[in-house]
Amino acid sequence: MRGRQKIAIVGAGLGGAAAATLLQQAGFDVEVFEQAPAFTRLGAGIHIGPNVMKIFRRMGLEQKLELMGSHPDFWFSRDGNTGDYLSRIPLGEFARREYGAAYITIHRGDLHALQIEAIQPGTVHFGKRLEKIVDEGDQVRLDFADGTHTVADIVIGADGIHSKIREELLGAEAPIYSGWVAHRALIRGVNLAQHADVFEPCVKWWSEDRHMMVYYTTGKRDEYYFVTGVPHEAWDFQGAFVDSSQEEMRAAFEGYHPTVQKLIDATESITKWPLRNRNPLPLWSRGRLVLLGDACHPMKPHMAQGACMAIEDAAMLTRCLQETGLSDHRTAFALYEANRKERASQVQSVSNANTWLYSQEDPAWVYGYDLYGQQLESGEAA
């Protein structure tokens, strides 16, 4: 006789970790399987909009995040060459008042560590590289490279753009290289202090075919981060990223504003990452398998909403499973897709176009969204 119903989550990134906590808080039995042997504080920043701070409020993490993160009063867009302001998008107290929560920027590793700590001890299993998925009718078996296996009633694929769960649903297909790369660097505050320039808390420098997004990643503002988007004809390197250099950055941003040049001068280590993508998927679930985040709608990071969409997915999937119960997972999955696909696809499209907040516009459709205030639209079971 089978025991209690169980949910397996493949991938313990920001979306998978959010799903684990939200599902556990809703009373579900959850296990998480992550292929990485452990997590490290990778050198990347992240924005958390009010739309997702409201989800962290439900998780009991909002106040901790507010203390950890930087709180920009504006998102500034500036001409990369002249420095002229293209837009001034109010955040800070305006965001709290108009959108219902704070807008913060934070180190991705600090956010991730907080999320992992919020999951019940013993839930997350590291070093679990998924090799095979077996549909056994009334359950799914997951076989891992270390020779172990597990069974679950449903499996959530939160395993990123190279998702094995997506591959099981739709077949093997490499993601599309976008033709752009992202340079990333964390800059110590002491390095910035050597320059008299004003380094704004959240600013995107633009020119015709490239940009640089810059912001603080801590409440103490002792760490400044930039991420770029630069055309790059081919990605023929091995691995997820390669080292870059000040020389490469100076060449890429030749003619840019002196403040940008000072940023490049202040860097100690720069990496370069390919920006990959997928076309919208024809389905998000089948049988006992369901996708969330980059596994089903990866996007270029130009709206600072990719991880936010994964966390929204996790919250909506939890809502739908609460609505139907795990025994009626097909209805839950149909509800989930019906209530997420349009929004996630719209964000994916705008993000890939790299037009977000270039000029003065109202971002309320993104930041003012309250997932828990949305009435569930009906979906037809797959």
From Swiss-Prot:
This is 6-hydroxynicotinate 3-monooxygenase. PANTHER family: MONOOXYGENASE, PUTATIVE (AFU_ORTHOLOGUE AFUA_6G14510)-RELATED. Gene3D superfamilies: FAD/NAD(P)-binding domain. Its EC number is 1.14.13.114. Keywords: Aromatic hydrocarbons catabolism, FAD, Flavoprotein, Monooxygenase, NAD, Oxidoreductase, Signal. Disruption phenotype: Cells show a complete conversion of nicotinate to 6-hydroxynicotinate. The keyword Chloroplast does not apply. Pfam families: FAD_binding_3 (PF01494). It catalyses: 6-hydroxynicotinate + NADH + O2 + 2 H(+) = 2,5-dihydroxypyridine + CO2 + NAD(+) + H2O. Transmembrane segments: none annotated. Flavin-dependent monooxygenase (FMO) that catalyzes the decarboxylative hydroxylation of 6-hydroxynicotinic acid (6-HNA) to 2,5-dihydroxypyridine (2,5-DHP) with concomitant oxidation of NADH, a step in the aerobic nicotinate degradation pathway. Its cofactor is FAD. FAD binds at residues 15, 34-35, 47, 108, 130, 294, 307-308. Binds 1 FAD molecule per subunit. Belongs to the 6-hydroxynicotinate 3-monooxygenase family. Residues 1-25 form the signal peptide. One of its GO terms (molecular function) is FAD binding. GO terms for biological process: nicotinate catabolic process. The gene is nicC. Pathway: Cofactor degradation; nicotinate degradation. Induction: Repressed by NicR in the absence of 6-hydroxynicotinate (6HNA) inducer. In presence of 6HNA, repression is alleviated. It comes from Pseudomonas putida (strain ATCC 47054 / DSM 6125 / CFBP 8728 / NCIMB 11950 / KT2440). The keyword Aminoacyl-tRNA synthetase does not apply. Monomer. The active site is at residues 47, 215.
